[in-house]
Structure formats: C-alpha cells, structure tokens
Amino acid sequence: MKKNRAFQTVVLLLFVAVQASAQKTGIPLVYSVENTGAKYDAPRFATPSQLPSVSTLPNPFVFSDGKKEVKKFKQWMKRRAEIAQEIQHYEIGQKPSVPMDSIDARMNGDTLIVDVRMNGEVLTLKTPIFYPQEGTAPYPLMIGASNNSLPAKLFKDRNIAMMVFFERQVNNYSQFGRPSGRGNYEFDRLYPDLTENGAYSEWAWGFSRLLDGLQKLGPEVTKIDMKRIGVTGCSYAGKMALFCGAFDERVALTIAQEPGGGGAAAWRVSRTLGNVENLDKTDYNWFKHSLKENFGEEKVDNLPYDHHELVALCCPRALLLLGNPDYEWLADPSMYVSANAALKVWEKFGIEDRFGYSIVAQHGHCQLPPSQYPEVEAFLDKFLLGKTDANTLVRIAPADYPQRYDVRPWMAW
C-alpha cells in the first residue's frame, strides 16, 4: 500500500517555511470578479498553419508574442488572461461575459433561481442549496459540477453548504440519451452566433451565472460566503469542474477528480501514451470541432499552449487534482507531467501550498478511497475554512512515476 501511495514530497520543515512565505506574499486567495483579465486586449491569434511546432510543453511564463516573460505576479495576471483567451479561441469556444444588470436572482425557500437575460431571450437556472445543520452563516459552499462525487460527509462534518450545477439547464449534451445537438441548446438561444462552441465553454458560462446570482443576492439572503466557494466534479464533470474553476476567479478552491484527457492531462504528453483519451480520441461535443482539424495527430505540437496552462489558470487560487491510475484511459501519467509543469507557476510566486495532486490506485472510478481523504480534507480546511495550519503540500503519485514519466524532458524552460 505504501508503494501505491509512495512518492510524497512533504517535509515538515519545508511545509512550515512555505506556510510562512505564502502568508507574507499578500497574493489574494480569491477574487470578487469573474475575470480579472477582462481589461486586457486579446493577443493576436495566429492561424494554425502559422504556429510554430513545439514538441515540449510551452513555457507558461512567456507572453504570446514571445518577447516578454513573466517576472512578477502582476505580469502573471496579464499572461493568465492571454492563456484563457487562447484556450477559448483554439479549443472550447467563447465564454461570453454577462453584465450584472442582465441577471435576476431570487431564493424560493432554499432553492436559488437565476434568470439570465441576453439578446431578448431568458435562460433560467435552478438549484437547491443544502445548508449545514450547525455552524453560523454565511457558510462556505462546495458546488458539484453535474453532481458531487466526493463523500458528503467531508462537507457535512465541516459545516460546508452544498449545491449542484445542473449543466443540462445550459447545454444538455450527454453521451447517453438524446441531447438537443450543437446549435440547439438553451445557451444557443441567447448566443445564436456561438454555435461552434464546445460544451465546456457553455457549461463554464452557466456555472458563472450561478455565482452571479449568489453575488447579486448577497450573503444576507443566500447565507453563502462568496470568498469561500469551491467546485468539484469527476470524470467528464472533473473536466467541467476544472474549466469552471479556471475561468471564474471567484472560485477559491477547485477539486478536479479523475478528469482524464481534455482535463488536467497535457495533449502533447497523452499522444505518447497507449490507449488513453487524447486530442484524437475524445468527445468533440465538448470541444470545438476545429480543434481536431487544426491540431490532430502530430499537429498537436502546434498548439500555442497545453493543459498544464489550463491548470495554471487557477493560480493564485487553490487547486487539487485527484487521479486513479487503475484506469488507463484517464491518462494519469500525462496529468502527472502536466501537474508538475503547472506547479512551477505557483512555486514562482511562493504559494506552492495552494496546489496539489494525489494519484492513488485500488479504487473504483469516481469513488474516493479513504486513503485520499486526508488530501481533500486538508484543502477544504485551508481554503474553505481558513485553517492556515492544514498541510496542503500534497505531491502523491505511484512510486514508479518519477522515473517512468520524467517531467524534465517536457520542460525546456
């Protein structure tokens, strides 16, 4: 069992030093707006044929024009905005901003109802909030993307409220049943010109509208603390949770459970593995069709970013990645490489305790084993409950990963 969990670089003295350093940085844990990068112009988007081939993971600190590199945290905020724009442009489609005067919100008992009014159309989101039986409002909140696959006990024991984002209210695509089809989803009524979008941009948009509703009503009405909101999900919803957390800076903590390819795993690395979800073998209802056309097979090296940079969009906020190497399709070796590359961003600003990964075997898909409870509990305690002494320096992977999947050749920076 120790070998299956082994490779955890947590040293008490280092932990204490990092805690002290992180507390002195003054770098925010969360923001009060969806997108701090809205003030920056989008970078110039090269056509796919104009993009250079880069076989290693692109340097997340180098700006899109290749002329500047991030040296200070303030520069990261602009670079972060560039990465977000690139992912939307080449991969998932546009996530439109919505002015607050287009949001109407109300509570019906414990159910949050949000009406989004755009282009003469109205889209309504409804979801109940499950409040703690004890504790004092305003409460921290964990939102499950599609559902909450993590054990409810972890939240109930900590007086954390729970909610589910029902993504079908925005885009009802599913690998089962009969979805409406691209161009015919609820989102498309409001944005008929964005039918090239993949589901992940639209789901991230809908998730943000729930946060708009909570923010507009305020804690006096919702009993929710907007500074202590988390999002989680597993499998395809693990990807969803990652996109939601990455693209909304009001999220203090993202826990992406077994997100697989198209989530935290890097497209470039996944292409070198076996039977895994990669850019050529994924569900293109989730992404722009042009992603495969422009970057399939060896052309993946032309992507101006990779998913270590999607992961890094969460910085400076908190992120925990959970993996399960028993399922080859999930491409956890690729997530391991991607996670260690992304970690460099948090490390650069002295806040590496805000990012962790735990890749543990011997359990079912989306079934968090008791052996992973401590990692989840630590992140909940620190980033939703404010317990600064919680140990979140989590770096757990199978014992053979460091040698078999050496991160260094992937990072030429």
Positions of PLM-derived features:
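Gly/Ala-rich beta-loop-alpha elbow adjacent to hydrolase catalytic centers
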Residues: 233-237, 241
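Conserved hydrolase catalytic core segment
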Residues: 247-252
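Bacterial Sec-dependent N-terminal signal peptides
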Residues: 1-25
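Cap/lid segment of the alpha/beta-hydrolase catalytic domain
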Residues: 144-227, 260-263, 267-269
